[in-house]
UniProtKB/Swiss-Prot annotation:
Keywords: Ribonucleoprotein, Ribosomal protein, RNA-binding, rRNA-binding. GO terms for molecular function: rRNA binding; structural constituent of ribosome. It comes from the Bacteria. Gene3D superfamilies: 1.10.287.1480. It comes from Protochlamydia amoebophila (strain UWE25). Belongs to the universal ribosomal protein uS14 family. NCBIfam families: PRK08881.1. This is Small ribosomal subunit protein uS14. One of its GO terms (biological process) is translation. Binds 16S rRNA, required for the assembly of 30S particles and may also be responsible for determining the conformation of the 16S rRNA at the A site.
Length: 101
């Protein structure tokens, strides 16, 4: 199990990213728009830099939904490799079987 504080911090970041997504997208588009004046583009970059760091999606980390483990994450199932192995061996994940040849 991951520390509860790490999992809560991740949830807080996810909420902040979702909340600021539109504003961040708008500022990013302004800063890359070559039809605007250089001053307007610079203002957009400054405003983007003043936004909270945690509102950037880069700071998000994939975590296992059951344990909160950040490493060994399997995107398709949203589980860590350890949890995935446990559940798969118990037959709790539909369509997943142990291979043999």
């Amino acid at each position: 199990m991951a520390k509860k504080s790490s999992v809560e911090k991740q949830k807080r970041r996810e909420r902040l990213v979702q909340l600021k997504w539109d504003k961040r997208k708008e500022l990013r588009e302004k800063s890359y728009n070559i039809n605007l004046s250089e001053e307007e583009r610079e203002q957009a970059r400054i405003a983007l830099n003043k936004m909270p760091r945690d509102s950037s999606p880069i700071r998000l980390r994939n975590r296992c939904q059951m344990t909160g483990r950040a490493r060994g994450f399997m995107r398709k199932f949203k589980l860590s490799r350890l949890t995935f192995r446990e559940l798969a061996s118990m037959g709790m994940i539909p369509g997943v079987t142990k291979s043999s040849w």
